[in-house]
């Protein structure tokens, strides 16, 4: 039997995805050489931050903790010791793909989710999918 996901779990996962995306960008930004790629990444960081602020305004009770932050930061630093823009674009694409899959899975399991929260989750998916498309030329 599949357990129903509650609203707090969905908010937590949404914030976790946004935070992980922003942390990854923060660690990679100074390693990007291509100016166009840098602008795409900066724009993505802003979109994630704006959506995170909307979530916090709508759900001020939401706990904002990033799961596995240390592991993410360590992995990024290790993978970018010897890297180039194509590898960075690949890492960001893979992270965005994982976020889309996770959010889709969660939403498919929940039928009675608050419509505002569903809208934010859909926004997160849309932002991530657009970002993936923009990154393709750098792979």
Residue ranges and their predicted role:
Residues 53-101:
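Carboxylate-rich helix-loop segments that flank metal/cofactor sites and access channels
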